[in-house]
Amino acid sequence: MSARPDPASASPGPEAVPGPVWLAPPQLPHWPIVWLVLESDPEGGPMDCALHSCGLAVDDGGSEIVPEAITADFEEPGGRRVWERFVARASEILDRYPEARWVHYSSDERASVQACAAAYGTPAGFFERLEEALFELLSRGVRRAVRLPLDTRTIRQVAALAGFRWRDPPPGPAGSMGRYRRAMASADPIDRAHVLREIADANAEDLMAMRAVWRWMIEQGPREYCG
């Protein structure tokens, strides 16, 4: 008869990775939704609105979204022209979908809106309408509904947990700004166009990642309060 192995001497198996711990049903606005990404200089001060790109998409909850890109040109430093184009397009969407919430991931977008509105101005009533419509997915959605075993400060890990497949490597805000600065230093229009296309693609990916997290929360979250 063979001896039983000593449990104390057995080699430990792989530790189980903790999963999501749901705290409450996700409290998310109804469709339609406008997904929003604003990219600016991550090292800028509160009034340094070095906005170089915007990504947005109207989502009715059914069909696939069509990301829109508003990117900087190279004629003027700072973000005035990007901001003016964004305000024009956002005004059209606010008029057409007055009840839609504008979903962004972290507090960065609200800070950019406030800084650019202060620096460059807005049409009467625009700032109040947009600020009222903003909905931060991280603080008002993710952190109120679920505890995750990862860093939630950026969307990358959260979206991956939700099943979204990212490109590799991710550009990130610092990478996008670095590419834009290199393009500003270049006189080659082909290089500049390529950089702006890369930035627009990265913003579109962020929009789709937010959508994936949103749908994951709706599908996987509890219907009743937990605990």
Residue ranges and their predicted role:
Residues 37, 137, 206:
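Acidic active-site catalytic centers that drive phospho-/nucleotidyl reactions
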Residues 158-227:
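Acidic, Mg2+-coordinating catalytic module of metal-dependent nucleases/exonucleases
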Residues 28-31, 48-52, 95-99, 160, ...:
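Short, well-ordered loop/turn elements at secondary-structure boundaries
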Residues 36, 57-59, 103-106, 202, ...:
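Generic beta-strand/beta-sheet core signal
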Residues 26-33, 38-85:
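Metal-dependent catalytic core segments for phosphate chemistry
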